[in-house]
């Protein structure tokens, strides 16, 4: 694997870890206590992170 390809794999691993933590947070009581505007931002963030993760998976699949 080329160095630039390994960086993409590493990036995907890091992103997946962060996304997993965010999704767990979204199911928690702290999230439920946040103002609706902040809940909306966090929900949008998780959706964008999921799309980003999909793009990285596609890139890795093309190696």
Features from the language model and the residues they span:
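Extended, charge-rich alpha-helical interface modules
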Residues: 1-63
């Amino acid at each position: 694997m080329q160095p630039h390809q390994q960086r993409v794999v590493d990036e995907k691993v890091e992103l997946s870890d962060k996304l997993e933590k965010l999704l767990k947070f979204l199911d928690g009581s702290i999230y439920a206590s946040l103002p609706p505007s902040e809940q909306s931002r966090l929900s949008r963030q998780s959706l964008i992170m999921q799309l980003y993760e999909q793009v990285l998976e596609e890139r890795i699949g093309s190696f």
